[in-house]
């Protein structure tokens, strides 16, 4: 267990922050995580880091007390995705995602695969990647606005047994209205200051804006990992979250 445990969380409190560990190797990852407090954030491992390090690093981080979001965006035949979700559950993963565009049978198979676990991972559907705009959707044959496609896929994910979806903060408010208060909304594209942003997240908001819109969890990568004082950033976002909840 990471020794840097704070008294931030009570049974009624939950940090909304998920830190994206966008590193390429185990050394840099562990060097960064060493100074984090698992009560101030969850952590996310994506394709690059998982491909480079495998499950050993993931299990090590879980054993240090972190809730781990395994962000591999499964998209395959139902049996393959179901088996992958079972492996994630066996590892003790907190959250795992899959493309909702994989369809109902794939998502239902995933939900059924983990249903028997006492503590099962949250199953999250990926709707429309936050880097995509309407012109990108048109190029792949979807003549619809991103917001409409997000709602369509989110409804499908919910009715297929998933716990929530990934969506931009702009879609959070309409999804809350459509899908209720218990559906988990995981929001990337969170920046401390959206002015002058020029990275690959197109539909972005600040933490306060995203929480007010209805997001459950906020995915933050570079604003935390490249900060001079990452813990100070996490404490500030959690302070904003507490104010938003009150």
Curated annotation (Swiss-Prot):
Substrate binds at residues 22, 44, 71-80, 130, 191, 201, 221-222. One of its GO terms (biological process) is 'de novo' pyrimidine nucleobase biosynthetic process. Signal peptide: none annotated. The active site is at 73 (proton donor). GO terms for cellular component: cytosol. Keywords: Decarboxylase, Lyase, Pyrimidine biosynthesis. Gene3D superfamilies: Aldolase class I. It catalyses: orotidine 5'-phosphate + H(+) = UMP + CO2. Belongs to the OMP decarboxylase family. Type 1 subfamily. This is Orotidine 5'-phosphate decarboxylase. It comes from Neisseria meningitidis serogroup B (strain ATCC BAA-335 / MC58).
């Amino acid at each position: 267990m990471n020794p840097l445990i704070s008294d931030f969380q009570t049974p009624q409190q939950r940090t909304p922050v998920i830190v994206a560990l966008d590193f390429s190797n185990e050394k840099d990852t562990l060097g960064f995580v060493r100074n984090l407090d698992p009560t101030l954030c969850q952590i996310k491992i994506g394709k690059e880091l998982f491909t480079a390090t495998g499950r050993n690093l993931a299990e090590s981080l879980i054993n240090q007390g972190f809730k781990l979001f395994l962000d591999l965006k499964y998209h395959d035949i139902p049996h393959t995705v179901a088996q992958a979700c079972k492996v994630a559950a066996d590892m003790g993963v907190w959250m795992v995602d899959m493309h909702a565009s994989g369809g109902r049978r794939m998502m239902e198979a995933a939900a059924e695969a983990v249903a028997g676990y006492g503590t099962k991972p949250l199953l999250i559907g990926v709707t429309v990647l936050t880097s995509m705009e309407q012109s990108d959707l048109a190029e792949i044959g979807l003549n619809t606005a991103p917001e409409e496609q997000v709602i369509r896929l989110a409804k499908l994910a919910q009715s297929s047994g998933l716990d929530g979806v990934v969506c931009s903060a702009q879609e959070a408010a309409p999804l809350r209205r459509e899908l209720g208060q218990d559906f988990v909304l995981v929001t990337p594209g969170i920046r401390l200051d959206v002015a002058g942003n020029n990275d690959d997240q197109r539909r972005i908001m600040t933490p306060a804006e995203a929480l007010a819109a209805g997001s459950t969890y906020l995915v933050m990568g570079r604003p935390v990992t490249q900060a001079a004082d990452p813990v100070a950033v996490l404490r500030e976002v959690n302070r904003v979250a507490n104010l938003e909840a009150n």
